[in-house]
Amino acid sequence: MVKRVISCLLVIGLLLFAALSAKADEGEPFKMYTTAYHHGEITASGVPVRRGICAVKREWMGLTAIVYEYKPDGSMGDMIGIWECLDTGFGGDADGDGVGSIESGKVIDMYFPTLEECRDWMEQTGGKVYVQLVDAEG
C-alpha cells in the first residue's frame, strides 16, 4: 500500500507543474513530463511488460521513443535510452477535462521492474525529458 501511495504521489507532484507544450512531430525532439511504473503484467499492445517499454497516448503506439536528458537550462542533453511505445494509460487529470496526462500526450510513462528503479528514474530526470518519436519498425 505504501509503495502504491508513493507512486501516486510521484505522479501527482509532476502534474502540479505547468504543462509543457508537447507536439509530436515525428522525428523532432520535444519536451515531455516523464513518470515511471512498475506494476502490471500485460501491456495495451498485448505483450508482457518488460524493461524498455513505455506508455504513451494511443496514437503513438508502435513508435519508438528516443529519450534525451532535459538540462537545468531547458536545453536538450545526451541520449538516455530507447523505449518501445507498446503500452498506454490514462495518467492524472490535472486540468479536469477528463483526459489524462498520458492520454493527452503530456507524459511518457516508463516501465521499470522495481519501485526503486522508478524512483531512480524520477531522480535522474527530474520528471522532464526530451522525446523523439520515430517509426523504427523493420
Descriptions of predicted regions:
Residues 1-5:
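Positively charged n-region of N-terminal signal peptides that target proteins for export
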Residues 8-17:
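Bacterial N-terminal signal peptides
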Residues 25-138:
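Solvent-exposed, well-ordered loop and adjacent helix/strand elements within mature globular domains
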Residues 17-26:
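Bacterial Sec-dependent signal peptides at the C-terminal "C-region" and cleavage site
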Residues 8-9, 22, 46:
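Compositionally biased regions
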